[in-house]
């Protein structure tokens, strides 16, 4: 809206006798009508200008930042031991302080049941050497797992990790997997978030994930939390909070201090951040990474200072990955 402008022009008086010479009072137009004729336009002008100022002030208060994705830092609540040989690809929390984890690497891929407090592997199902384990989720009594560079997935019994069956999905590849208790969410390393029928594994819907105008590529491990899908962004220290209904990023979680802390402590063999688990009952959030010796319970804190596009792009956005090792 245009800014207020001060009115500086006024009509010039003509130097003729009718204007310059005062009229006898009895010959002048009624002064009441003259006052009304002057006051009414001024009143209307002031009203319009004043309303414009109020409207401009009100509208101006709603900037891009008010509808921008929130940015969150983290506080470490607790640290737990984690197998430093586990190339974490999928992670989830079950009841009674139990975690399920899918690990990758050729010849080392597995599905495992892990005690949260001790990090001890309580049960383990090794995968055939031809498969590279990827995302994992729990629906009912069954664990669903996808594999890298293939459209093959597996279903396991959650109690003893025995394999039920294989399935074939329609994604380009298998990276991440999560569920809301009804359908599956999947990623294939692109910017696409899939909604998958858990009975026939057909794609029910899909959304391209975007941060403002930018596609968010390399979507990796997933977790469903309070109506949102949270995704690790491969090769970054960021988690994207995604609205699965339209693909919009509604928040960023910045976790770079975890990896930096491990490196400072001498753990130089670690790989990238990967693995999100949510304890819905106790509202606890856990994260870890590939070959990390620790698993963390974290708490989120909104970052109040403004983050511009450049900072988020540098920290969280990556170039598309051409289906290499996730």
Predicted segments — roles?
Residues 1-32:
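Short, low-complexity, Lys/Arg-enriched N-terminal segments of secretory-pathway carbohydrate enzymes
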Residues 114-119, 157-161, 198-201, 243-247, ...:
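Short loop/turn segments that connect beta-strands within beta-propeller blades
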Residues 272-326:
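Blade-level signature of beta-propeller repeat domains, shared across WD40, Kelch, NHL, RCC1
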Residues 99-106, 143-151, 184-190, 231-235, ...:
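Conserved beta-strand positions in repeat-built beta-propeller and related beta-rich domains
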């Amino acid at each position: 809206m245009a800014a207020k402008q001060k009115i500086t022009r006024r009509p010039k008086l003509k130097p003729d006798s009718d204007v310059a010479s005062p009229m006898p009072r009895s010959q002048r137009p009624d002064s009441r009508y003259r006052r009304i004729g002057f006051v009414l336009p001024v009143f209307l002008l002031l009203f319009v200008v004043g309303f414009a100022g109020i409207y401009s002030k009100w509208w101006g208060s709603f900037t891009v930042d008010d509808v921008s994705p929130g940015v969150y830092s983290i506080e470490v609540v607790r640290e737990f031991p984690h197998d430093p040989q586990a190339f974490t690809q999928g992670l989830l929390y079950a009841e009674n302080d139990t975690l399920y984890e899918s690990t990758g690497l050729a010849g080392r891929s597995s599905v495992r049941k892990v005690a949260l407090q001790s990090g001890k592997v309580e049960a383990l199902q090794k995968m055939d050497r031809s498969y590279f384990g990827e995302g994992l989720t729990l629906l009912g009594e069954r664990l669903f797992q996808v594999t890298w560079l293939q459209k093959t997935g597996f279903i396991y019994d959650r109690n003893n990790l025995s394999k039920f069956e294989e399935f074939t999905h329609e994604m380009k590849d298998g990276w991440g997997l999560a569920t809301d208790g009804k359908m599956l969410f999947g990623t294939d390393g692109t910017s696409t978030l899939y909604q998958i029928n858990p009975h026939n594994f057909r794609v029910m819907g899909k959304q391209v994930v975007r941060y403002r105008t930018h596609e968010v590529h390399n979507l990796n491990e997933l977790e469903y939390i309070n109506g949102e899908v949270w995704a690790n962004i491969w090769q970054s220290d960021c988690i994207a909070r995604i609205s699965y209904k339209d693909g919009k990023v509604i928040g960023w979680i910045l976790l770079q201090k975890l990896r930096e802390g491990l490196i400072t402590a001498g753990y130089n063999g670690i790989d990238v951040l990967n693995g999100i688990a949510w304890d819905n009952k106790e509202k606890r959030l856990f994260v870890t990474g590939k070959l990390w010796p620790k698993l963390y319970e974290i708490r989120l804190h909104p970052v109040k200072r403004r983050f511009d596009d450049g900072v988020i792009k540098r920290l969280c956005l990556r170039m598309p990955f051409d289906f290499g090792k996730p």
